[in-house]
A protein has these predicted regions:
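Compositionally biased terminal segments of proteins
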Residues: 1-188
């Protein structure tokens, strides 16, 4: 499928999350054609994916190190740089790449298949839980606390608890007591 066809599909797609994931899949394909790695969806868009759109954000946050390649690809499909965001007026879409990589070499990612050979990578749920728990604890973000509890209730039996606890004790996170309390509260 050609780039213009994918852009038309994105424009016609009703689900905001599916539109975002299709855009990341297109970016992934274009970057891989340049022998570059796939970007990884992080932040609110990843939270929207795992919460099944209980939470929604209007922008796409990506972890990607090669800003030059990403900028070139975004420009080639009609995005314009506006401050820290790349904006596509026609698609009413905004992309930001606030992180150059995921936290740690062993950070898992979920690869989402979208059909027609399109796929995108999303931060692993354990790292997303830690990220949102940090926002809840350190920035006093109530919604992030609620979303962490929702994720633990929904995915608790499938989470990699040793990995989560290993990440939670790192000095930059310091969220082990919160993780253990949430685990207890949801009955795991």
């Amino acid at each position: 499928m050609e780039t213009q066809e994918i852009l038309k599909i994105i424009k016609k797609t009703e689900s905001p999350l599916k539109r975002q994931l299709l855009m990341v899949a297109l970016l992934t394909r274009l970057l891989q054609m340049m022998n570059k790695q796939a970007p990884v969806v992080i932040g609110g868009c990843a939270l929207s994916y795992y919460s099944r759109e209980v939470y929604f954000t209007s922008d796409i946050d990506l972890a990607y190190a090669d800003r030059e390649a990403l900028d070139r690809v975004l420009r080639s499909i009609g995005f314009e740089k506006k401050g820290r965001y790349w904006v596509h007026e026609g698609l009413k879409m905004a992309i930001e790449a606030p992180a150059s990589s995921l936290p740690g070499q062993d950070s898992p990612v979920e690869v989402v298949e979208l059909g027609e050979g399109l796929q995108c990578s999303i931060i692993g749920i354990e790292d997303l839980v830690i990220d949102r728990l940090n926002a809840s604890k350190h920035w006093k973000s109530e919604i992030d606390g609620e979303m962490v509890e929702l994720l633990i209730r929904r995915y608790g039996n499938n989470l990699d608890w040793p990995y989560l606890e290993k990440k939670a004790v790192l000095p930059e996170n310091d969220t082990l007591s919160e993780i253990l309390e949430l685990k207890r509260r949801v009955g795991l």
